[in-house]
Amino acid sequence: MARYIGPSCKLARREGADLSLKSPSRALDSKCKLEQRPGQHGAVRKSKLSDYASQLREKQKVKRIYGVLERQFRNYYKNASTKKGNTGENLLQLLETRLDNVIYRMGFAVTRPAARQLVSHRRVLVNGKLVNLPSYHVKPGDVVALSQRAQKYLCVQESLTIKDQHGSAFSWVEVDSEKFSGVFKAFPDRADLPSDINEALIVELYSK
């Protein structure tokens, strides 16, 4: 299946949630009515879903937040289920260690799609080596940096400014904005991750 490149508002309305697909400096457009489904005459969202529908919607929401396709997501789940500890938390940790997500968390890009572009266009180095795979998994202690060319991008500089204005610092990454680099210090704890994600529903869905 091809990656979705349409309006981000449509996805947000489909899931009834802000998927962080727009810059924090731009609130969701007033036309983006999250309580209604996509379409000019989108029906108002039902207050109660079946268990299966709730599980499916949660999976779709998380896939869209992290920009992962179905096959990738299923592989992440299989990997998470073989690790020690809570499968749902393991799944979120795997998603958080994707290089595109780390670039986003460090504040070098305002959205994950923008971070994915930086990686795909060969503008990111890990431990001094060029990496162009958005799905590359960063490990604790890895140093992530932007190329000299990327450091001059206005979008990168604006993103760092937005990060400072919103105070969006994360405890598991340490960023040196002046050097356009950061260290992935540790795997994030569940308490550090978004509370609006219910990973237990995803585990229930795949456990059937």
Curated annotation (Swiss-Prot):
Pfam families: Ribosomal_S4, S4. InterPro entries: Ribosomal_uS4, Ribosomal_uS4_bac-type, Ribosomal_uS4_CS, Ribosomal_uS4_N, S4_RNA-bd, S4_RNA-bd_sf. It comes from the Bacteria. Signal peptide: none annotated. The keyword Ribosomal protein applies. GO terms for molecular function: rRNA binding; structural constituent of ribosome. GO terms for cellular component: small ribosomal subunit. CDD domains: S4. GO terms for biological process: ribosomal small subunit biogenesis; translation. The keyword Metal-binding does not apply. Keywords: Ribonucleoprotein, Ribosomal protein, RNA-binding, rRNA-binding. Residues 97-158 form the S4 RNA-binding domain. Belongs to the universal ribosomal protein uS4 family. Part of the 30S ribosomal subunit. Contacts protein S5. The interaction surface between S4 and S5 is involved in control of translational fidelity. PANTHER family: 30S 40S RIBOSOMAL PROTEIN, SMALL RIBOSOMAL SUBUNIT PROTEIN US4M. One of the primary rRNA binding proteins, it binds directly to 16S rRNA where it nucleates assembly of the body of the 30S subunit. With S5 and S12 plays an important role in translational accuracy. This is Small ribosomal subunit protein uS4. It comes from Xylella fastidiosa (strain 9a5c). The gene is rpsD.
